[in-house]
Amino acid sequence: MVTKDRGRWGVVLDDDSGTPPGDGAVLNCMRARELGRTNIVVGDRVGVVGDVSGREGTLARIVKLADRTSVLRRTADDNDPFERIVVANAELLLIVCAVADPPPRTGFVERALVAAYAGGVTPVLCLTKSDLADPAEFAAEFAELGVPVIVCGVDDPVEPLLDVVGGKVSALIGHSGVGKSTLVNRLVPGADRATGVVSGVGKGRHTSTQSVALPLAGGGWAIDTPGIRSFGLAHVTPETVLDVFEDLAAAIVDCPRGCTHLGPPADPECALDKLEGASHRRAMAVRGLLVTLQDNEDWELDIDRD
């Protein structure tokens, strides 16, 4: 599945080798009635019947949705029970973040890391706009997490990133204005993804309005997704959040039994309070998320009791 727009899906046929070819015709497809309201997203592998010639004006039917190997999800905010599937079957999640204009946000990256690990996708941090600021300081925030960091400014070679994504299905996410579409155009010359400018208040202009999978010259796919303003994690469990961050997971080994890691007064001896530097900042941000997720669980328990 390479495109989705208003009840129509674009599908490229493969040759059963497991990797779709980059030069196949895009079939215009509708969802078969027997699939009901099954959510089919970019990255899904599907079975189609009917006219599969790809000629203009033809329409095939999607009759089967294959099991997904990974699912990247998000919610509008941390209290929203409605999950949105960003992409299916991605192997890599390229978290695109500018080091300036707009200023980088550690919270967004960390939330994307949680969603990636929860969805079975391997994250890679891609730092853009290195011509405007030194990316080293922001990259250091994640040094203890073992996440690959690739500097992808317009003056930096794109080959290191191409080496990573070659032969794989990679999804790109990022706030509007961080240079995601520019990066896509470098990965897939001729993709002609629209690029925009950042407004005077540091907010980007949405230039990618629909997700689309683009074939890489060396094999594999780059899935460009619309710029996002929020990355809610209401669908993630508190245990998953802590397991994502190696520095936090190592620290809570020293917590007393029964510690919920929510901090005082409930957990006055939580080991997260003893961390320093980037780990302490991350622990406090994660704690805020844990409080919200715990409130969600308590609310669900109250509903069940009713």
Where are these regions (language model features)?
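Structural detector for short beta-strands of small beta-barrel domains
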Residues: 1-7
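Beta-strand/loop nucleic-acid-binding surfaces
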Residues: 21-40
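Phosphate-binding glycine-rich loops and their immediate beta-loop-alpha structural context
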Residues: 82-92, 96-150
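Canonical P-loop GTPase G-domain recognition
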Residues: 129-178
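Walker A/P-loop
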Residues: 176, 181-182, 186
